[in-house]
Amino acid sequence: MEKKLLVVLFLSLCCASRLRGEAAQQWTSATATFYGGSDASGTMGGSCGYGNMYSAGYGTNTTALSSALYGDGASCGACYLVTCDASATRWCKNGTSVTVTATNYCPPNYSESGDAGGWCNPPRRHFDMSQPAWEAIAVYSSGIVPVRYARTPCRRVGGIRFGIAGHDYYELVLVTNVAGSGAVAAAWVKGSGTEWLSMSRNWGENWQSNAYLTGQALSFRVQADDGGVVTAYDVAPANWQFGSTYQSDVNFSY
C-alpha cells in the first residue's frame, strides 16, 4: 500500500509540474513565410550582425522578425518555439515544432496589404523563417501559414563570444552565442585599467564603447532581457586586435 501511495504521489507531482510548464508557456498567434533557399545560404548576414550563421553557431534554424517582434534589434539572438496552427490551415505538418533563433529583420512592405504580401507590416507578428526551419513544420507549396509561438531557452555550445571591430576610441563589440534568453539587453566592458563602462546598442547585437581600451585586457558583462547577468573576466588579452573574436568560458544556463 505504501509503495502504491508513493507511485501515485510521484505521478501527481509529475502532472503538476507538466501543467505548470504548459501554463508558463505563453503561446501567441502569428504568421510565417520562408526565404533563403533550401540550404539557408540566403539567410547569411542580416540586421543582427551575426554574419555567417554557420560559423556563428546558429545553423540553419533561423528567422527574420517583423517590426512588432524585432524591437529595433532587442530581440536579436532570442529563441522561439514555433508550431504550425493546424486548426487554421491544412498545410501544417501535424505534431511538429521547430526552435528558431532571431537573426534578421523583416521590413514592412507598405505597397502591399497585410494579407497580400505585406506580411511584415505593423502591427503583424510575423516570422520570415529559413526554408529548412519552415519545412520542419509546414508544406513547402503553402507559402504562408498561421503559427503559434512562444519564447524558449536558447541552447548554445561553449561560452559567449565577443567580436571586436572599430578603432581607437570606438570599439564595436558583436556579442554572439548567448544561451538562455539569447537576447542581450545591456552590456559593459572593463579594461584592465578602467572601471566597468556601459556600452550602447549601435545596431543589432553590436555594442559600442567610446573608451580608449587598446593595450588593456578586456572583461565583459552581459545582461539578458530576462534580467540574468554573466561576467566574463579577461576574455581578450592585452594584445587583442580589432577584427578578432574572443570566446569566454561563461554563458547563461538554460
Swiss-Prot record:
It comes from the Eukaryota. One of its GO terms (biological process) is plant-type cell wall loosening. Expressed in roots. The lineage of its organism: Eukaryota, Viridiplantae, Streptophyta, Embryophyta, Tracheophyta. It is a peripheral membrane protein. Keywords: Cell wall, Cell wall biogenesis/degradation, Disulfide bond, Glycoprotein, Membrane, Secreted, Signal. This is Expansin-A9. Residues 169-248 form the Expansin-like CBD domain. Disulfide bonds join C48-C76, C79-C154, C84-C92. InterPro entries: Expan_Lol_pI (IPR007118), Expansin (IPR002963), Expansin/allergen_DPBB_dom (IPR007112), Expansin_CBD (IPR007117), Expansin_CBD_sf (IPR036749), RlpA-like_DPBB (IPR009009), RlpA-like_sf (IPR036908). Residues 45-159 form the Expansin-like EG45 domain.
